[in-house]
Design a protein with these regions (language model features):
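Membrane-proximal helix-turn-helix segments that form the acceptor-binding/catalytic region
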Residues: 110, 123, 136-184
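Short aromatic-enriched loop/helix-cap "lid" or pocket-rim segments at secondary-structure transitions
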Residues: 26, 55-60, 104, 127-132, ...
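Short, compositionally biased "basic patch" segments
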Residues: 38-55, 134-147
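A short, charged, and often flexible helix/loop element on the N-terminal side
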Residues: 49-81, 93, 154-167
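Structural motif corresponding to alpha-helix initiation and N-cap regions
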Residues: 73-80, 99-102, 172
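Short N-terminal targeting/anchoring amphipathic segment
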Residues: 81-100, 113-120, 184
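N-terminal subdomain of nucleotide-sugar transferases
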Residues: 3-50, 84-86, 104-117
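Glycine/Thr-rich phosphate-binding loops of Rossmann-like dinucleotide-binding domains
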Residues: 21-22, 101, 125-126
Length: 185
């Protein structure tokens, strides 16, 4: 006799993969965790993007992706449509920076689905995600004053890129995106 296992929970798992070949703990955790959830009877729908998309983008594509870090209309729309179609019980967000953007959090909340997030790094207190300046521990942005990273060019050793990233995180801190749009960490 064959007895079909009931699905315990339907989970929409969202992740922004790093570039192929980069050693990324959060990429591995995402893969392992979603596989484990499925092994235990959950249905997992994956919505992922990869930073490899930057490599294939021309100048216009890279500019568009830069503005998309603040708010990705494409990913907001895609996540809303996926939630509408699949009707998950919960949305589990792993890494959303840079391509997915916090817009996906708003898409999930607007759809009425609970959002949980796994923090794989210190990105919410250090937009560079490492809490390091060179090899030294740094907590200058820990109080939410992300503009300090501009002084040191923390993001990719570039003051301009640091300014862009700091602006994005300041905007989302003002909107309380990481507090109001996520139900549990």
């Amino acid at each position: 006799i064959y007895v079909e296992k009931a699905v315990i929970m339907k989970i929409l798992a969202i992740h922004n993969f790093h570039r192929k070949g980069s050693a990324s703990g959060d990429d591995q955790v995402f893969k392992s965790e979603t596989a484990l959830l499925e092994e235990h009877g959950n249905q997992v729908i994956r919505y992922t993007v990869s930073n490899d998309e930057f490599d294939d983008a021309g100048v216009i594509g890279k500019l568009s992706a830069t503005f998309g870090m603040l708010w990705s209309f494409k990913n907001y729309r895609n996540v809303r449509q996926l939630i509408e179609k699949e009707k998950p019980d919960i949305v589990h967000v792993h890494t959303f920076f840079p391509l997915l953007s916090p817009s996906i959090l708003y898409a999930a909340k607007k759809s009425g689905v609970k959002v949980v997030a796994t923090l794989h790094d210190t990105r919410f207190v250090c937009p560079c995600s490492t809490s390091l300046r060179g090899t030294e521990l740094c907590n200058e942005c820990g109080d939410g004053k992300y503009y300090r990273m501009c002084k040191y060019g923390c993001f990719k050793n570039s003051k301009l890129q640091s300014f862009i990233v700091a602006s994005i995180f300041i905007y989302h801190r003002i909107r309380k995106s990481f507090y109001k749009q996520i139900d549990h960490y």
